[in-house]
């Protein structure tokens, strides 16, 4: 479960929750009931009911469902001539009367399947004018909740006397949003959740790229800046009505969250304290600072600064990197001190050893990082390089040149050294950068960010590299596809997979590092031992560490293999066996071949030959880095040609799969994708291309006056 956001900590005390379901959530585009969404809603209510929450539903949708049904009945009962006549709009009250029974029948059926009882309560605004009605309503609901029955409210539109625009002079309620707010007050709810067809309240129409979600509504800050779009496609008031109801309810003491009824398990996420949707709370103005800089503003500022950086000469950009390297070494003691505080806190918090290992800045690491930055600085300037030059026609020359991508977002867990690597690569490639690190490395990241940005000259601006330390969730950053050009996740399989599934922004990275070493029957076993020990023990938490050792079946009982296995055990490596190795050597059975240990553990299995090894790698590997140890060059070439991984080695440790070791300078990460960049990615992975055409007034004019030559020209 995600950690509770500080602004949502009140959910720990929530017992009674009212959930209002909008028509757009209950129904599909064609007006029919959205069975999947309603079913998912009922499953969440069931789970809450089982956990001891008191859940009250307020549902819309009767009018829409009834209208669809009556239109169908009218269609099947009409002649062709009738259908040619102007069609009168169906009476909304009749639609409500027909739709309500169908809507409740669905709820009743779904809840029965979940072994939950539900009840229907239809009300009108005039009912609430009677104090005795209110008293009886409360008693009835209390009785239902005591019996763990789900009360389902809806306005009785079939007999309501209110006319458009649906706001009565009494101001009791005017739609189901305001009904939900009224019930929250009457029934003393601890929380009101308004489910919509959008993620929450935006600063403008959600379809506009410039609109940003508002996670905590503050009247003084947001009332004037919000621009509402169209109202709901099927309901009465859309977001305007929800905000009005939310403000009234929250001012009366009931917190309100507006969130999407389309998102998976959104209700449970709200009650787990996740920062989704928009929160309305009477104390919100005490939490949020109006001076907070949004991540969107940080991204825009980073792009502006990157353009200043690109305007510098190659030597000026080189000097910035050299200054950064010097600054890191000059501040090593301070950096190590802050990192040690992070490591100590992680150990006290009980973090797993692999994460603590990745978090730790070991002695010599700062010097190593500074060296890689200087190597990067002394490499050929990657920006504005002419990659191709073509004479399109006489005096019409086309150049394909390298240029920065724009603004990068790196989301990383624990690894503070990743911040340094990415920052230096961003500077060298002329890109702006946003950094979102894990809370476990907050002190390390903060000091590293300060040291680096202090070395950036004023004519570029320290906002070139932004460190996101606000409570913004990763999900919010991933929605900034109009201002962020590439996401680079550095962390767990779960983190990378979630990011790839949650954004329109291109993602560069790998979800798994399941690297193999295959020992062929002709291998030099002393060499194999040397390679295997390095691949597993040198840095077990690294993504290029060996996770599976494949061995030719002829070596099963060989002294050389015994020597390797004993050496691994002596170093403290836990060995697990595949089906064959488990049976033959008695190792504990591996849970799965597709498993990244990231620790002192590995899987061993036997294969028939090199092709079997290749098939195993393709089936269970992650296309990261795989190695063969053999003295048979023909077998080696077969392995090198056929293994479809980002990096494939012969007689060399998988630990060589690294940008610095490849001579790329610092490393942005390792990509197992096939588009844009693959394998260890250096500065070239942060570049794109553009076309520059130089002419002398030529025009196309239907190609009448152009003689195309398309002749390749020297680059210089």
From Swiss-Prot:
One of its GO terms (cellular component) is cytoplasm. PROSITE patterns: GLUTAMATE_5_KINASE (PS00902), PROA (PS01223). Induction: Induced by salt, drought and cold stresses, and abscisic acid (ABA). Gene3D superfamilies: Acetylglutamate kinase-like, Aldehyde Dehydrogenase, Chain A, domain 1, Aldehyde Dehydrogenase, Chain A, domain 2. Residues 297-716 are annotated as: Gamma-glutamyl phosphate reductase. One of its GO terms (molecular function) is ATP binding. Substrate binds at residues 60, 157, 176. One of its GO terms (biological process) is proline biosynthetic process. Residues 1-296 are annotated as: Glutamate 5-kinase. ATP binds at residues 196-197, 202-207, 236-242. NCBIfam families: P5CS, PRK00197.1, proA, proB. P5CS plays a key role in proline biosynthesis, leading to osmoregulation in plants. Involved in abiotic stress tolerance. This is Delta-1-pyrroline-5-carboxylate synthase 1. It comes from Oryza sativa subsp. japonica (Rice). The gene is P5CS1.
